Amino acid sequence: MGSIDTVGMGQRAIDQIISELSLNEKVALLSGVDAWHTFAIPRLGIPSIRTTDGPNGARGTRYFNGVPSACLPCGTALGATFDRDLIFSLGQLLAAECRAKGAHVLLGPTINIQRGPLGGRGFESFSEDPVLSGLAAASYCSGVQDGGVVPTLKHLVCNDQEHERVAVSALVTPRALREIYLLPFQLAIQGARPGAVMTSYNKVNGLHASENPGLIRDILRGEWGYEGAVISDWFGTYSVADAVNAGLDLEMPGPTRFRGPALMHALTSNKVSEKTLNERVRKVLELVQLASRAGVPEYAPERKLNRPEDRALLRRAAGESVVLLKNDKNDSTNSPILPLDREKTTLVIGPNADLAAYCGGGSASLLAYYTVTPRQGIADKCGAEQVVFSQGCYGHKELPLLGEHLRTIETGQPGYTFRVYTEPPPASGSFKGSDSRTPVDELHMTNSSAFLMDYSHPQISGDTYYATLEGTFEPPESGVYEFGLTVAGTGLLYIDGVLVVDNKTVQRAGTSFFGIGTVEERGERYLEAGKKHHVFVEFGTAPTSNLQHHHGVVSFGPGGLRLGGCRKLDTDTAIQQAVQSAAQADQVVVCVGLSGDWESEGFDRPHMDLPPGTEELVNAVLAVQPNAVIVVQSGTPVTMPWADKAKALLQAWYGGNEAGNGIADVLFGDVNPSAKLPLTFPRELSQNPSYLSYRSERGRVLYSEDIYVGYRYYDTTGQPPLFRFGHGLSYSTFHLRDLTVRETAPYAANIKESSLRVSVTVSNTSARPGAEVVLVYVRPPAAACSVGRPVRELKGYEKVMLQPGETREVSITIPLGLATSFWDEGCDAWLSEKGLYFVEAVGTGEGNTLVAPLTVQVSRVWNGL
């Protein structure tokens, strides 16, 4: 990579460079040159650096036809591990993946708060708790930085819903803003000093975050002393002078909308001073300097990594993220149902059994090196002859992608041929052989979801162009097949020359492609097994459509198309078949849940329910096989009306490349579960604290639950949820004793000199090695508090691995200010009030809780990190 001065470059070098930059060059540096790269100035040795999504894998520069990558478990899965060392190692892996993709800046982690269960991007973030989120983010960032890559904390702040995300104003009290939504950023910056922070799309109390001086200038840079770069979310800049003056350094992506000539005009009219401009330029140059540590060449080619040690780490992460929610006894053996016996035949049922639900949708999605389904993971462990499968029902929102099941006409390779044209198709239809157009590009592809945001070709200018998708489909069995076509643009699907889906003539707005696309339009056709059926799609990019976009969404240019298909299923018959098999089976695993179809950037879920047919399937199987193990995959809470009937229940999230192996490892005891819920699972949607005020209404969303987010609400109101925050069982048993709490410097005038040292003795009282997570909560003074406070709040945690019979002391150090303070709106600062607090150490299992008193001798006010 070209470099400013990668060896010993200091502040004076940057000062010198700024003095040599022309005004036009300074302005150019403050925006991207394309979707993923910053502006270069070769004459001064300033290179372009590359950014990449994030947060659970490094995609590289291409949504469209990209290079495969390693996919980590989703954010909530990582939060469930409560393992900072593991997350640090995964950060190191992400850095290596970034370098393989030629990237210097990773756009992750996401550390927004799941104030409710429906947020489309809820799966990306670690937890509903700000301390767990902030400490996990610090470990993530430290690991990424250890590999020389710059991590990016996102999204500052209150980007907690997708509905009207670029237009909505989050109305939040100063106290809730500080104690819940900003605290993860504060802790991550304190613990890791990441090189970049990304602003959110939304407004905060009436002002967009990317032009909000209170957030960027006063809190981030002023109070916290943050010295890194502040970059916009993609197309999340809304002004010229306001954003620059507030402290937004880099507008992304390019070409610019609000810098360039507009910023030059703001400079000449004194809307922006050159001093302020130089401050923004300095931060961009410092980002480039920091990025040079990666040793990645400028505009480096993208390549695969996929190392054996990475696959092992991903498998470990997948297994250690699985939460054991229930493990009751088998009535016939009087032993816990799990782990299962690999010598017995296992019946695997359900919509997620043969589906690789490895990641959520949107900017967190990527093309994985490989994926493992639960069925495959179980078969690989037990032997294929020991595993029987029954579908039960489908769980997809959109029909499964068809691309990998197609074959090219020319060579018979898996996939299809994608041809790009600058001219529209003939009126008679290009599939009839009357197409005289010459394609400007021809690609062989397997992924039939094609998002064209970053597709480019020298012969194409602008966003208007056309494409065809062509291949053959040979069905494994005869029957009626459903096909679905989703577009941000226009599309027609032909099977054997017959129009099966028209998504052009009349279109319906949907949530696809970040909210700018259509619903999936479907059609049916009877197909014969063993026959090659011709599949052809005519597509026009987004400008060819007259569809009106939803208000408050981000438009990503040319749009895209998605082609899906599968055999039509009679759900009642499929459930009946599954039930008949379950009644005779030795042991049964039912795999249900969501996928990236249901949880994605661009839209929120309308409800917490699992897909249609799922509840009926689970109830029917449990009626004949009460010992069936239920495995749920989702990134955020779902309703489980059958949970009281289920004796064995796992929450398995989106587990990345190794999702299926991680599930199988826990099911059969190769991994002893140690994960805990990082989110509260309510019994139903109306029980959650944000129920009455989640969506945008006339451009604003009221955070009416205030500081009582997640478990803070349930604990304070005494409402029992379905599963509590921090719940998670093990195949081992543990015992906590001898809790001690010691305060250092109890009378220090500066509370930052004071801390708590919480120590507890932990014993493994079982015959199986296992890991225990010790959660430390602090209860505020019951009578002496000057404001209402939650019953208890998480302030620290530690994970410890113990052999059978082993005993160890676990010590956790917590800053006293973090442990005892609330945000005092009267003095605009943190206040630690004197009084009698109680410290709780909580382990696995009912009643495994210890309590010790803590007396804070003096009240103290503080600010900053």
Curated annotation (Swiss-Prot):
Glycans are attached at N330, N447, N503, N764. InterPro entries: Cellulose_deg_GH3, Fn3-like, Glyco_hydro_3_C, Glyco_hydro_3_C_sf, Glyco_hydro_3_N, Glyco_hydro_3_N_sf, Glycoside_hydrolase_SF, Ig-like_fold. Its main location: secreted. Pathway: Glycan metabolism; cellulose degradation. Its EC number is 3.2.1.21. PROSITE patterns: PA14 (PS51820). It catalyses: Hydrolysis of terminal, non-reducing beta-D-glucosyl residues with release of beta-D-glucose. Residues 411-579 form the PA14 domain. The active site is at D233. GO terms for cellular component: extracellular region. Keywords: Carbohydrate metabolism, Cellulose degradation, Glycoprotein, Glycosidase, Hydrolase, Polysaccharide degradation, Secreted. It is found in: Secreted. The keyword Glycoprotein applies. GO terms for molecular function: beta-glucosidase activity. It is an enzyme of class 3 (hydrolase). Pfam families: Fn3-like, Glyco_hydro_3, Glyco_hydro_3_C, PA14. Beta-glucosidases are one of a number of cellulolytic enzymes involved in the degradation of cellulosic biomass. Catalyzes the last step releasing glucose from the inhibitory cellobiose. Belongs to the glycosyl hydrolase 3 family. PANTHER family: BETA-GLUCOSIDASE, BETA-GLUCOSIDASE J-RELATED. This is Probable beta-glucosidase J. It comes from Aspergillus fumigatus (strain CBS 144.89 / FGSC A1163 / CEA10).
